[in-house]
A protein has these predicted regions:
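Alpha-helical interaction segments
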Residues: 12-13, 71-72, 90, 131-132
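Short beta-strand edge/turn micro-motifs at domain boundaries
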Residues: 112-120, 124-162
């Protein structure tokens, strides 16, 4: 008897919201570590390794504050955006080192498929003085071979102002 049974995990809204919270918490943690370069570097690498899919293939990452090197298609490019200190991305000052005291996601909508999902909305970054910065996002997610949810699309932009 050969039962060829496959178990599939369907991506849920809870999965998306958990990864969004983990991403925001990691960004806040990076800012709190900015005076300890080694710990900050380790946390940045951990964030990217845990949540992004660079080790699985292409990641399309367009950060908010990137003009000269707009697209971060490599692990090193993403890391530089978050914590700076990379001469190949000299415009980067380290977005996560602002620092931020809170990051809150507000999904406008989410498209859920069996092995992939897309979320679009606004996220809100709170500065130490309480000022809140609103940023628009689109994130794409996929399940890797271990059924871990990973980011393979990340586009951020500041809202249009006329």
């Amino acid at each position: 008897l050969n039962l060829n049974i496959k178990f599939y995990t369907m991506i849920t809204l809870d999965n998306i919201e958990n990864v969004q919270k983990e991403w925001g918490d990691s960004l806040v943690k990076l800012g709190s570590l900015k005076s300890n370069k080694e710990a900050c570097n380790n946390e940045a690498e951990s964030l990217i390794n845990r949540l992004y899919g660079y080790q699985n293939g292409t990641v399309l990452f367009k950060p908010t504050k990137a003009k000269d090197n707009q697209f971060r298609l490599t692990f090193e490019g993403a890391k530089s955006y978050f914590i700076g200190e990379n001469s190949n991305f000299s415009e980067d000052k380290g977005f996560a080192l602002q620092p931020w005291t809170n990051v809150r996601f507000e999904n406008a909508s989410v498209i859920l498929n069996e092995k992939s999902a897309t979320a679009m909305g606004n996220y809100f970054f709170t500065e130490p003085n309480g000022n809140v910065v609103k940023v628009e996002y689109t994130f794409g997610y996929f399940l890797d071979s271990n059924q871990d949810l990973r980011i393979n699309l990340h586009h951020s932009s500041l809202p249009y102002s006329n």
